[in-house]
Amino acid sequence: MIFYVHGFNSSKESSTGKMLAEQSGRPVVCLGYDCSRPFKKNLEKLSLEAWKDMDGFDVIVGTSLGGFYACEMARELQTCAVVFNPAMKPKSQLKKFLGGNVNFATGEKWMFTDDILDSYPEELKAPKGLPVKAYASREDEVLPGNGELVQKAFNDFEWVDSGHRVADFRKYIDEIKKYENILGVSPNE
């Protein structure tokens, strides 16, 4: 099963998750979290939602803050992940969003508070002993300098020639499917 976790200030109804499903030709479970809630509550909710649908051939795909959550979920659920521009230092990288925000996907207005910011860890520790593939952009306009942090943290790493947002998953689909079937068994289609 492919799971997708959206980035900051978005939702599970985002176009990115839908694009992943269309381009992979596979069912994708888009998982959502509320950016106005504390990190641990979001992680617990995401992990529980994924656990209910896991079939043993699972990969969690995440973009930006969703990449951060995907790594934390992979560690908690002992499964694979493929992440794109994962937020490596969420506490400092999210600071610029303190105050009023408008959700990109829903248009809903909300407040990002100091208490919520403080609920995030200082940095992402790449899951050790788990198959995790990380991609990072050299031209990340949202998280400048993040790519170098990703490169240092992940053993299975690749640079991409794009901006922060994943505009097309097609060139990554084979890798995502490989991680979904890391045990070498293909689910019947």
Question: What are the roles of these predicted feature ranges?
Answer:
Residues V61-A70:
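Gly/Ala-rich beta-loop-alpha elbow adjacent to hydrolase catalytic centers
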